[in-house]
UniProtKB/Swiss-Prot annotation:
Protein task: May act as Rab effector protein and play a role in vesicle trafficking.
SUPFAM superfamilies, sorted: Calponin-homology domain, CH-domain
Predominant location category: other
Low complexity composition-biased segments: 327-338, 1005-1016, 1303-1316, 1326-1340
Superkingdom of this protein's organism: Eukaryota
Pfam family, one: CH
Basic and acidic residues composition bias: residue spans: 376-405, 426-439, 1017-1027, 1191-1201, 1217-1231
Domain C2 NT-type positions: 8-157
PROSITE patterns the record matches: BMERB (PS51848), C2_NT (PS51840), CH (PS50021)
Description of its domains: The CAAX motif is a signal for prenylation and required for endosomal colocalization with Rab8 and Rab10. The bivalent Mical/EHBP Rab binding (bMERB) domain, mediates binding to Rab8, Rab10, Rab10, Rab13 and Rab15 (in their GTP-bound forms).
The name this protein goes by in its record: EH domain-binding protein 1-like protein 1
Amino acid sequence: MTSVWKRLQRVGKRAAKFQFVACYHELVLECTKKWQPDKLVVVWTRRNRRICSKAHSWQPGIQNPYRGTVVWMVPENVDISVTLYRDPHVDQYEAKEWTFIIENESKGQRKVLATAEVDLARHAGPVPVQVPVRLRLKPKSVKVVQAELSLTLSGVLLREGRATDDDMQSLASLMSVKPSDVGNLDDFAESDEDEAHGPGAPEARARVPQPDPSRELKTLCEEEEEGQGRPQQAVASPSNAEDTSPAPVSAPAPPARTSRGQGSERANEAGGQVGPEAPRPPETSPEMRSSRQPAQDTAPTPAPRLRKGSDALRPPVPQGEDEVPKASGAPPAGLGSARETQAQACPQEGTEAHGARLGPSIEDKGSGDPFGRQRLKAEEMDTEDRPEASGVDTEPRSGGREANTKRSGVRAGEAEESSAVCQVDAEQRSKVRHVDTKGPEATGVMPEARCRGTPEAPPRGSQGRLGVRTRDEAPSGLSLPPAEPAGHSGQLGDLEGARAAAGQEREGAEVRGGAPGIEGTGLEQGPSVGAISTRPQVSSWQGALLSTAQGAISRGLGGWEAEAGGSGDLETETEVVGLEVLGTQEKEVEGSGFPETRTLEIEILGALEKEAARSRVLESEVAGTAQCEGLETQETEVGVIETPGTETEVLGTQKTEAGGSGVLQTRTTIAETEVLVTQEISGDLGPLKIEDTIQSEMLGTQETEVEASRVPESEAEGTEAKILGTQEITARDSGVREIEAEIAESDILVAQEIEVGLLGVLGIETGAAEGAILGTQEIASRDSGVPGLEADTTGIQVKEVGGSEVPEIATGTAETEILGTQEIASRSSGVPGLESEVAGAQETEVGGSGISGPEAGMAEARVLMTRKTEIIVPEAEKEEAQTSGVQEAETRVGSALKYEALRAPVTQPRVLGSQEAKAEISGVQGSETQVLRVQEAEAGVWGMSEGKSGAWGAQEAEMKVLESPENKSGTFKAQEAEAGVLGNEKGKEAEGSLTEASLPEAQVASGAGAGAPRASSPEKAEEDRRLPGSQAPPALVSSSQSLLEWCQEVTTGYRGVRITNFTTSWRNGLAFCAILHRFYPDKIDYASLDPLNIKQNNKQAFDGFAALGVSRLLEPADMVLLSVPDKLIVMTYLCQIRAFCTGQELQLVQLEGGGGAGTYRVGSAQPSPPDDLDAGGLAQRLRGHGAEGPQEPKEAADRADGAAPGVASRNAVAGRASKDGGAEAPRESRPAEVPAEGLVNGAGAPGGGGVRLRRPSVNGEPGSVPPPRAHGSFSHVRDADLLKKRRSRLRNSSSFSMDDPDAGAMGAAAAEGQAPDPSPAPGPPTAADSQQPPGGSSPSEEPPPSPGEEAGLQRFQDTSQYVCAELQALEQEQRQIDGRAAEVEMQLRSLMESGANKLQEEVLIQEWFTLVNKKNALIRRQDQLQLLMEEQDLERRFELLSRELRAMLAIEDWQKTSAQQHREQLLLEELVSLVNQRDELVRDLDHKERIALEEDERLERGLEQRRRKLSRQLSRRERCVLS
């Protein structure tokens, strides 16, 4: 498919269609010995277009038999049609290369021998010309020594037009065709001589597929998942193959290998209990699970995945076929779905959604697998060490296995919906097999664990979603979480290794906690778990938990967050297992401990309020404790994580008992879990920490208790509960059922809570809390060095708690905040108010909703989210690329509300100073970044969920957009930073230059851009507004999910429109028409559209949007010719449409010369410039400038002075005219356009503010300004010929002038300064400006202009100096963006095709959207400059330039950089020059008039004289006659 970016680049350009004809004359080909070509074909090709000549035989030469020729006795002509593009102000066409390829045709196969490229733009011209060409081709085969092709090339211009005209489109480039069968020459692998030195041959041989035993076992999976990369299979397969025989599975290995249906049936027959059961369709009822007869499994589903021995234990994971690509919000089928199937008859949706996300999670898991295996081993050790625990299950184990198998079967049915799950299963299988090899008990446990664990491991990522989904479908909430990034898994791996060392200890905890992931699944099963047999579950849970916990750990804290987030369910299940393991004791502990925890938390909050210093110390201690705990947790990470889950469950139970308060407790528990996770993460981050963790773990739960005591008591209790849980594990048997009952209760409560309206807040909260805690604790580590920050945190917490209307909620929030907020405070340390606002917003939400528990949870989640964001912010400063990803993740994780709240604090930390930020960042950056990435992955996973999570994601995305502006001195600088364009400069700018005052302004600007002015408490207002999701105009598109949801929302209610993806949903054009009709009903008659008329529907929509100013990327042919439209093009086009329709188009604030990136902001209406910028002020400026004119020759200066009064008066007139005309309002720095002409460029933001005219091109230093134009230069302004000459001169003097490259460079810089679109008029200094440190935070601190540049400036005298400079700067900026966009598009397309890394794909999509928005801003700005440059009417030109100057003068002098000041000087010079020209015109007119009057008088006198003379003659005649 044609490049999306190239289409975007063509917008606004001129196109010319040429017909090129190549006439072949001779081909000379020299070959190596022992080989000669058979038939030779010359191919003229570009992309997928191939024009082939006839096949000709090669005739060896007489002198050199290895050098032969092909001679065309009758020249052979081949012709092609090519569309070439050029900028409107340039005559040279852009390069377009076509390639000549020499191919050898032998036995029906073609091999490439040599190639050469020809740039057709060099041969294109208005006049047909024939050019003889002799091409030296580059050999592509070792068999070719030399090749030359002689031909004649001619080009004929067919027609010219706009790049977007229908007849300019190349159908061939619209078609997405697979390349032909001509492969790169493998150098004829069949020849023996090539084996030694022919690189192609070995490769070719290596490519030959060789049977792989492990793959044979997975034939079904592979076939089902064909086309989807399964990187993990290879890794897992060897171990699977090895483990197959030892696996204690009753089913023999051979049956496992059987293919598809047969395999499953045979396995069932042969392997009584364990035989792989055919995956059950999601409809399978829970009874099927409970039943233990494999025979009962439904007939093998179409493609049951037969896994090797132990694989059978694992539920085959169904692929989500259609859903996979969507990454829908439904929880992944994996574990959750299996249980969901039981709990709900319709888990398929969730499953499919899960499938979509499974992909990434699987990969992550793959990386985490090694650790998972270690965990498994540790678990095995554990099971061996604790025969009781395993023993409990041992009896029913066979039954348990069956049950598990069946569950796995059920899951399998669901699992098949998600290919990712399959991969996860493969990984887990290997783990399971490890366990199996060690012992039947372990095997029994592990298989079951695998059955559950496998899905579970995946579910964690999706659990993040689960959090969201859980609320929707309480039971089916388990979704497979995307695995955390490989980096995380690597770190986790280290931790896991340490844990493996302390395996037994952990196992106790893991048995409890290990279940969390698995039990998360159990949650949904809740009662079904009990029905199946709690003990077997427990044992299996242990194994599974261990594996799961390890998997979770390997996946990363992010996974845990997802679990916690998803969590109500996961934790509940975890609790089910954990509770079972812990037994009643844990109940008691939890029951007694949690209330105490609340009290303690409240007390802690109070103490924090009273003693900030103490709180700091405590916080540092807490941070240390958290780390210690993290270490312990890491040991028991599984245990801890699970334990938190257990605690959460207990809390849930208590919730049942305590009612609403229980919810808070649950959240608190979640927060604790997150804290633990965070700590673990921090431990993971540092190997030393890991060691410490191991040590602390070794020390025993006592340490955990001690640490817990340091941490809020709730956490301490949690750890204690976990500790007790270990002890209770022994007593597990007795308390299992009770625990299960409690678990069921907690599950129900959790489900209820979820239903009540957590809206995914639990998931978000958990994820957010975890992320926050993770980041927070890391921050805490950082903060430990910054007591002040912690003190602030304390204050914030106090404020939040006190301000909260719901004390319980506040307590929970405070608790979370204590765990996470304190650290956040450290981050946001300077901004207690913001946090308090956040708390207030949370309270407000809680109060308004009336659901204190859930609301409080939401508030907490937001707080956590906020912290997370804050954490990210400091990181962003130092590692912007990471930050961007992290921010995205965070945004997704948190709701938009949270983000806004977070933003303020985030910016504040920067305000606090780079030192603090650096201190925080330095210690935690790497870990935080990783954590954030993990979270990001999770966030991305559930951010993509289509359900509520989707809504949250969209808002978050919006928040991200707003956030970036605030965080990064420029709305888009942040994103640029993400793209790596700005680099660290942005962070420095933000830190150094952002002032608290500017932050609010930036927020206001972004808020305005979003179309939602903020209330006095922006956080509250934004949160309240955005909760519904659609009330406030969305910010710039930042994720594919948010874009999809916006489209769905906007097209709701339109006939025949159902949007579920970015491809087929848009093909018939009705969806585009619906969006157009929604915002511009007068542009299209929707009722008259025919759903079957694809071409016409799309044409109407595209034409309508093009008329409004939306860059035209799609053509009706795209939709007609392709049954599945190109996803990236559709997404990009919709991104533009959304930005336009919501008024969120980017505005170019200023361009930076010298390679610096420009500054952009969301196009929001800006207040008009101060009134003092009236004509009088302008005139004064002009007058003063004319007087100063340092470089002007005296003569010119005198003229300028003399003209000043006239200038002033004219300025006044022009100024008033512009004001009256409304030009000022649109102030879009669309200098060249009059408001009526759509200065806003259809952006819908007439107040888009003028661009800050900045002319970095001259290198930011006020260089010598050329004197005003010599007089007389415009004496014949209206002479058409002169106008044409003038334009040609302008072209020559522009950047394209060959003789004065310096001038071009300078112009480019200047152009850059103003390149943006309706460049926002700098009204009051925009946030971006204020953020720009006067010294040069702006990337363009350029050296003084070189003499060559000064000369270039002089050359601008004949044209518009200002406009030329701006255009050249614009070109520089475009080159930068184009270079990055080409890379991003390639990466994005490869990721979209493979679906391998959804997280990375989402990050790239956000960067892509940002680049597209910037490109459109530059296009709009270029249009303005083009209009300005072509404007020849002096009056109008003067008006436009004066408007530009007004926009610049709206900025305070002290805020202007040297480049801006120089640009202003250029503008003044241009205006002075214009005034001089006008004066000259007036003088000329006066002079001509005087001459004319004199002539008239002379003629009159002459006539009078003639009359007198005639009269005298007549009188004489009369006399004569009379006489």
